[in-house]
Design a protein with these regions (language model features):
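Feature captures the catalytic cores and cofactor-binding loops of soluble hydro-lyases/lyases
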Residues: 1-138
C-alpha cells in the first residue's frame, strides 16, 4: 500500500502518538510503541514519513576488506523526500550509527528524520539543525 505525500502531511498535522497507538490496538496490532529507551533529541519536533530500514550488527574484529559503512551510505544516499531512516541496532548500546553528517545528508535529500535504538553522536549540531531524531541514547 502506497501512502501519498498529501496524506502523510495531513497525518503530521493532525495525528499524535496516543491516537495512533489506540487505533493500532483496536485493529489487533498490539504493542506497537517504541521502547522507552528510544527518545526524541527534541521533544518539540514531529516525525512521520515512509520508513527506510537498516540493520546494524556488532563488529568484533577489524577486517580491512570489509567496508563497514557501504550499506549505511547507500541507504542514506537513496533516501527520498518524505522518508525516515530507521536503523535497528538490535538493542546494542555500543553502536552509534547516526550523527551530524548523516543528518545533513538525509536532510539534503528531503528525508524527514531518523529513528534508531542505537546511540547518536553530535547531538548539539543535530538539535541546531532542527532535524527530528529519536534515539536509544547519546
Amino acid at each position: 500500500m502506497t501512502i501519498s505525500d498529501e496524506l502523510l502531511e495531513q497525518a503530521r498535522d493532525i495525528l499524535y502518538t496516543p491516537v495512533i497507538s489506540d487505533t493500532l490496538d483496536s485493529m489487533g496490532l498490539l504493542s506497537q510503541a517504541l521502547p522507552p529507551t528510544v527518545r526524541p533529541l527534541d521533544e518539540n519536533l514531529v516525525l512521520c514519513g515512509r520508513a527506510r530500514t537498516g540493520l546494524y550488527m556488532p563488529l568484533y574484529h577489524d577486517n580491512a576488506e570489509l567496508d563497514v559503512y557501504e550499506h549505511e551510505i547507500a541507504l542514506v544516499d537513496d533516501l527520498k523526500p518524505g522518508d525516515v531512516a530507521v536503523f535497528s541496532c538490535a538493542g546494542n548500546s555500543r553502536i552509534a550509527p547516526w550523527g551530524e553528517l548523516l543528518s545533513t545528508a538525509a536532510h539534503a535529500r528531503g528525508a524527514l528524520g531518523c529513528v534508531t535504538d542505537g546511540l547518536v553522536r553530535d547531538v548539539r549540531m543535530i538539535r541546531e539543525m532542527s532535524f527530528p531524531v529519536f534515539a536509544g541514547g547519546i
